[in-house]
Amino acid sequence: MTMRILKIHYIVFILALFVAGCKSTDNAYLFTSFHEPATEGLRLLYSYDGYKWTDLDRTFFTPTVGSKIMRDPSMIQGPDGTFHLVWTSGWRGDLGFGYARSKDLVHWTDEKFVPVMAHEPTTVNVWAPELFYDGETQRYIIIWASTIPLRFPRGEEEENNNQRMYYTTTKDFQTFEPAKLFLDPGFSVIDAVIVKRAKKDYVLVLKDNTRPERDL
């Protein structure tokens, strides 16, 4: 897998699909979101051009696992049409992330907490899990940011905010491969997203979490 690490000023990660419930039959972009203090749950916005966005003005799913919050929701549609959703389920202290699935974006089932970092009990956080489907291996890849104190050189950040990217893979969201280190760029990093541009051409977009810039 060839990857390029890009730093850009801003990025919005969107999923192109049909917006359920809209009167138009045109394809649209769907934007997953949440409102602070992150206790309401999944919110969605849609756009036909990627520039002008309309809030669907409702909560589609309220989490009940982990610390019962939803931040950083990431959603992908699988080959069978099922929507898979993962999210940050706790600010600090949770050793995993939340998961649920849906066929129509309205009715969600199989909600659970996935304790991907349970084998590292000193882990401070599991933030911003991002989904990617690898059609070549027919597996879902989930990447996220975690801090394990004293695991890496501290650099500019405090020890409890020295983030690195980790990952797991799954075919069915029932069993998950043991979590492994995905990326150590030598500085604190969060909010990474995998984008496939062409066959064997992948891009990794990430946030340099080093203060004060915190650049993408």
Descriptions of predicted regions:
Residues M1-I8:
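Positively charged n-region of N-terminal signal peptides that target proteins for export
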